[in-house]
From Swiss-Prot:
Enzyme class: oxidoreductase
Chain's gene name: nit-6
Record note on cofactor: Binds 1 siroheme per subunit.
Alphabetized PANTHER family for the sequence: NITRITE REDUCTASE (NADH) LARGE SUBUNIT
Region (Disordered): 1-23, 998-1051, 1124-1157
Binding site for [2Fe-2S] cluster 2: C981, H983, C1058, H1061
Record bears the keyword Zinc-finger: no
Pfam families linked: Fer2_BFD, NIR_SIR, NIR_SIR_ferr, Pyr_redox_2, Rieske
Binding site for [2Fe-2S] cluster 1: C496, C498, C531, C534
Domain of life: Eukaryota
Protein name in UniProt: Nitrite reductase [NAD(P)H]
Residues given in the record as FAD binding sites: 26-60
Induction per the UniProt record: By nitrate.
EC numbers: 1.7.1.4
């Protein structure tokens, strides 16, 4: 299976870049095929998804790029191919896909910046090629090993350097001479490279003695102090390598002999030191330093450094003094420094490749002081140095910003303290250097035990203030709290704020056995029956508690799918390509003919949307949608809807703002800026939605999907667009992400954010996916959320180039959509995911499951199939018919009284349920109490055409006098009830889900309870009849040809789930299935041959007395004087009310205490500055 990991050289995923790929490619010529040169090429190929460049690289050696850091291993296998950084096939592959051409055994002879051309020695593969024109030239020529040219005998036979494969091969050939066996081999230089060379001489196994000569008092003098060096010295000597310290070579003494051609030849005989001592030897390897290879640039007139090791002078962008010529790696001199470690060279390559490919989407990166931390195993000794490891000797080079500001303010001097640990028995030495207050780690060194290296280096890089004493770092003591232990919430934690249900309230009935299912728990405690936002946590507590009691907890979607979770159903629907609820019920349901319920319907609708992306109002899917999706707007407290056009990344033009203002003013809509940086218009009547959206769509706006379990917004700060601190183009990236994922539906809502720097103004760290710009790209954080149980995001990937952001997020979102449970946010999903973030990284970044290509392709298919739902609805007459308050009249009726608040109209407050908020009258008993009933025609039966084939049937809201009624046709049967849900006295039952309990066996329409016999005369005129008992009803004289009548109570009788808080009412008995205190009135209903639907109703005035809208609608004053009345009174008494533009003043503690006393202190909790006054 093809590896689609992002470590591959290229990605086929679309880039957010708007640039065209038809422009001619620019040529980049790279001089030098070493580790830094190939690092640049790899990064450029990876980032250049638009294929803007062709690359030509030349290398002097006959080998492709190999690992110079691992040169010592060459002596064990002597196969250079084992050191190759990429196999030869890699070069062939990218010749085809990325226009990479490489020439080996080819030297750069001269450079002409004026003509932008490079003269080269003819490559063996292309002898006619002598000149390479370039658009950009990258000099990665590296360095050469220093030889002491002033030392006599430095050029004798037997003198080597330790730099490349050719040096090692020469050393191997030399050591095969029989004269060498048993002799002494010498390494001059006790640094990193010198100790590596010493190991190489040992591995040759021909020298009787290997000696290292170091002019300082200890080895590794550039990495460790004297005490640490002495410990290394002890370890090296223990392995059989002799070390002479404080020795300087005066002369290499030679034997002068003649070869077969009688040509004089000098051969190493020994070393004379400056102190007069002599050491006989046959072989010398100099490892005394390096010199930058800058001759090509120097001869071309490009500025080079004159001191130190030379080097081609570069600026922070790594450009030389010549236009379009750059230098990276050991040949580059940055701020007077050259770097002989691979790390800084790779960082240079990274910066340059990023700027060539990503700078048009992001702030160009600059090269900064590199991290010179090293961790090596030299001759069996573990050695590491990190950060400012000589800060105690030379003074600190850099201080944490916070400390630097404090010292600047106080005029103090930077002081450091070193903490040292030495264990002579285990040969362990550690020295960590801290600021004088012990709050910051600046650097350190480790010998013998380097296990803490990975943990400590980030503390230095990030300047993180320590939360443990320095001694705990150096001793490796366990930080208090490292053991996470039990992360369960305390028992008194409030889980459901709507009904003030604590964790203990949920656990107790489960442990007592009173509740054995999630539905029982909701009915018993009322948790999750309010806003529903606590349900993920309620479910989690239920599952944990039941598991602790030894009860098996099945993660099935609902009773209709007892064997399958949402993820299971996703796979079944995907593989079998199911597209309707009946199809799914037949394939996976407990009852093939079931209508489903309020749990499985929206979950299956979400799966359909994630797979097939059909319109939510299409006939097959409309009945599966919750009320918000059903009318493409969030239903509000009073039954009206909110209107939220998309404002990608919060960026909006003045023209669109004006249109929004005009629409809000025309339809008297309450307006508010949302937390997602867009404008919400509240109070839109269902019958006005089409007209409102027509104006918005005509102005170039589209649905913001604020109503859907889908991508909501991608919030952004202004980033580099305006902010002087901006590092990345957060607005541009957020716009691209929101435009890409708009309309994407999932198990729950999805929110994103992009911040332009670490100040994090967009709060990307608590989003389902968030980006924070860094100098190298973006850090990608995932699986955070606010809500009932807030959770900070976790880091998925660091420093991701902009072109790789989208493939990663594509994979993450699709994997979440495929595997999450119903109504499970990404935070809870990750918590429940086996293996957690480490496993997710393997799946998303390393393609552990081999599905990354599939995830990207599926996301692209959804992106390509996007359409604006509101624009489609405006062009579909059938959809438009659904936007009516009443099916039998164009009249409107307000569902709740309104009041003016801060200049805008809003619905009055709901009273508390225990103070009249719920209508707990015996509505179901009205069937026995009507003085008389007559069959009344209410609506043409054609309105319900096609209902029998739909998962929710077809419903209608009917106005009769002042009373609102609801009528359904479901699987050939009619049902009627009051429109009002008594829980909150809202008028919306006709817009709810219809559900049935699953039968033990498959049901058909014939298995439903039979219709009552027909006795009333078939007539359009009212016919009176006496009241009937709940178990008997007046029957019509003749039934319609469809035999379609009221369905009495039975095992498969349907219920209606209120769209507000999911109270479920039987459409036959009127009883509430999940709240025994509530009920609704139901009515007999039938279709007759005259094409009308009839409901058996009492007289209008009697109907209105019991069910009239004016009687039950929530009115002003019912909720009391308001939650903030006391606060308003306080402000009024302080003279604050109504003032604008005032300067803040803080009341004195004594004055506040006199006026409001203890009550104010309890309400506010005191001020953050120590006073009890209010702080806003």
């Amino acid at each position: 299976m093809a590896n689609t990991s992002l470590d591959m050289a290229s990605s086929t995923s679309p880039s957010p870049s708007p640039e065209s790929t038809t422009t001619p490619r620019k040529r980049i010529v790279v001089v030098g095929l070493g580790m830094v040169g190939i690092a640049f090429i790899e990064k450029l190929i990876k980032l250049d998804t638009q294929r803007q460049y062709e690359i030509v690289v030349i290398g002097e050696e006959p080998h492709v790029a190999y690992n110079r850091v691992g040169l010592t291993s060459f002596f064990s296998h002597r196969e250079v191919e084992q050191l190759y950084l990429n196999p030869l096939e890699w070069y062939k592959q990218h010749l085809q896909t990325s226009s990479l051409t490489h020439h080996l055994s080819t030297a750069a002879l001269s450079l002409s910046p004026a003509t932008k051309s490079l003269t080269i020695s003819p490559p063996p593969s292309t002898p006619s090629l002598t000149t390479l024109p370039y658009d950009h030239l990258i000099l990665a020529t590296g360095s050469s090993a220093l030889l002491p040219t002033s030392t006599p005998g430095h050029d004798a036979s037997g003198v080597f350097v330790y730099r490349n494969i050719a040096d090692l091969q020469s050393l191997i050939t030399w050591s095969s001479d029989t004269q060498i066996k048993g002799s002494t081999g010498v390494v001059v230089g006790g640094g990193l490279l010198g100790l590596e060379a010493a190991k190489a001489l040992m591995d040759l196994q021909v020298f009787g003695r290997v000696v290292v000569i170091e002019r300082n008092g200890w080895v590794l003098s550039r990495q460790v102090d004297g005490e640490a060096g002495a410990l290394v010295l002890e370890g090296v000597r223990g392995l059989g390598v002799e070390v002479l310290t404080r020795k300087r070579v005066k002369e290499v003494e030679c034997d002068e002999s003649k070869d077969e051609g009688e040509k004089e030849k000098k051969r190493v005989k020994g070393i004379r030191f400056e102190d007069g001592e002599y050491l006989a030897c046959s072989t010398i390897c100099f490892a005394i330093g390096i010199k930058a290879r800058d001759e090509l640039a120097r001869e071309a007139g490009i500025t080079c450094a004159e001191r130190g090791g030379g080097g081609i002078v570069v600026d922070d962008s790594l450009q030389t003094s010549a236009p379009d010529v750059y230098a990276i790696g050991e040949c580059a001199s940055w701020k007077g420094q050259t770097f002989g470690l691979i790390g800084p060279g790779v960082e240079m390559a990274d910066v340059l490749a990023f700027n060539f490919t990503q700078a048009h989407l992001h702030t160009p990166r600059v090269f900064k002081r590199p991290d010179l931390s090293t961790k090596l195993k030299l001759l069996g000794v573990e050695v590491a140095s990190f950060g400012d490891f000589f800060a105690d000797r030379d003074g600190p080079k850099e201080l944490p910003p916070k400390l630097r500001r404090e010292l600047k303010k106080s005029g103090g001097k930077a002081e450091v303290k070193a903490l040292t640990y030495k264990d002579p028995f285990l040969s362990v030495y550690k020295k960590y250097i801290f600021t004088s207050d012990g709050k910051y780690l600046l650097g350190g060194m480790m010998i013998g035990d380097t296990t803490d290296y990975v943990r400590l280096v980030p503390l230095v890089k990030t300047h993180k203030e320590l939360d443990v004493p320095p001694s705990q770092l150096i001793l490796g003591a366990k930080k208090s709290g490292d053991d996470n232990g039990d992360d369960d919430l305390p028992d008194d934690t409030q889980i459901c704020s709507c009904h003030n249900v604590t964790k203990a309230d949920l656990v107790a009935p489960l442990k007592s056995g009173e509740c054995t299912s999630l539905g029982d728990l909701k009915s018993c405690t009322k948790a999750g029956t309010g806003c529903g936002g606590c349900m993920p946590l309620v479910t989690s507590i239920f599952n944990r508690t039941m598991a602790s009691l030894g009860t098996e907890v099945k993660n099935n979607l609902c009773p209709h799918f007892p064997e399958y979770s949402r993820a299971d159903l996703y796979n079944i629907i995907s593989v079998k390509r199911l597209r309707t609820l009946p199809d799914v019920m037949r394939e996976a349901g407990a009852d093939a003919d079931s209508l489903g319920c309020e749990a499985c319907k929206p979950a299956i609708a979400s799966i359909f949307a994630s797979l097939w992306n059909d319109h939510v109002m299409s006939p097959a899917h409309h009945g599966l949608q919750d009320t918000n999706d059903r009318f493409m707007g969030n239903i509000q407290r009073n039954g009206t809807f909110s209107v939220v056009p998309r404002v990608a990344a919060g960026e909006i033009t003045p023209e669109k703002l004006i249109v929004i203002g005009e629409v809000a003013k025309e339809y008297n809509l309450y307006t508010k800026i949302t937390g997602g940086q867009r404008i919400d218009m509240f109070g839109a009547k269902k019958q006005d939605l089409l007209k409102i959206w027509k104006k918005l769509v005509d102005a170039g706006m589209e649905s913001g999907h604020a109503y859907a379990k889908s991508l909501r917004t991608v919030k952004s700060c202004v980033g580099t667009t305006w902010c002087r601190y901006g590092v990345g183009d957060s607005v541009g990236m957020a716009v691209r992400l929101e435009e890409r994922y708009k309309g994407l539906r999932g198990p729950h809502k999805i929110k994103g954010g992009v911040s332009g720097c670490t100040r994090e103004c967009a709060e990307a760290g608590n989003k389902d996916f968030g980006l924070i710009a860094t100098e190298k790209g973006f850090n990608i954080l995932i699986c955070g959320n606010g809500g009932t149980t807030p959770k900070h995001s976790v880091l998925l990937a660091k420093d991701v180039p902009p072109t790789n952001v989208i493939p990663i997020i594509d994979r993450f979102l699709m994997f979440y959509i495929r595997t999450a449970d119903k109504l499970q946010r990404t935070a809870r999903w990750l918590e429940a995911l086996p293996g957690g973030i480490d496993y997710l990284k393997e799946v998303i970044l390393e393609d552990r499951l081999g599905i990354c290509a599939s995830l990207e392709a599926q996301m692209q298919e959804l992106v390509d199939s996007y359409f604006d739902e509101w624009a489609e609805a405006l062009n579909n007459p059938a959809m438009q018919e659904r936007f009516k308050q009443f099916a039998n009249t164009d009249e409107g009726q307000p569902p709740m009284e309104v009041e003016i608040d801060r200049g805008q109209e809003r619905p009055v407050m709901w009273p508390r349920e225990d103070e009249g908020g719920s209508a707990k009258a015996d509505f179901k008993g009205l069937r026995d109490k009507w003085s008389s009933t007559t069959w009344q025609p209410v609506l043409e039966a054609s309105y319900f055409q096609g209902a029998d084939d739909l998962p929710n049937g077809i419903s209608a809201s009917i106005k009769r006098g002042d009373t609102q009624l609801a009528v359904w046709r479901i699987k050939g049967k009619y049902y009627a009830s009051q429109q009002m849900c008594p829980h909150k006295r809202t008028f919306a039952l006709s817009d709810g889900f219809v559900g049935t309990d699953p039968s033990p066996s498959s049901c058909s329409s014939s298995a439903l309870p039979p219709s009552p016999p027909s006795t009333p005369p078939r007539s359009s005129s009212p016919v009176t009849s006496p009241p009937q008992s709940p178990t008997s009803s007046a029957t019509p004289a003749t039934t319609a040809s469809s035999s379609c009548t009221t369905n009495p109570s039975g095992p498969a009788s349907p219920w209606i789930s209120c769209p507000f808080h999911k109270r479920n009412f039987s459409l036959t008995s009127g009883s509430c299935k999940n709240d025994n205190e509530l009920s609704i009135a139901t009515f007999d209903v039938e279709e007759r041959d005259d094409g009308m639907v009839y409901i058996k109703l009492p007289p209008v005035d009697e109907l209105d007395r019991e069910l009239g809208t004016k009687k039950w609608m929530v009115k002003k004053g019912e909720a009391g004087e308001g939650q903030l009345r006391e606060l308003d009174e306080l402000n009024k008494s302080k003279g604050v009310e109504g003032k604008k533009g005032r300067r803040g003043r803080k009341p004195g503690a004594s004055e506040a205490g006199k006026e409001v006393g203890k009550k104010l202190v309890e309400a506010v909790g005191g001020g953050g500055c120590g006073g009890p006054g209010l702080e806003w």
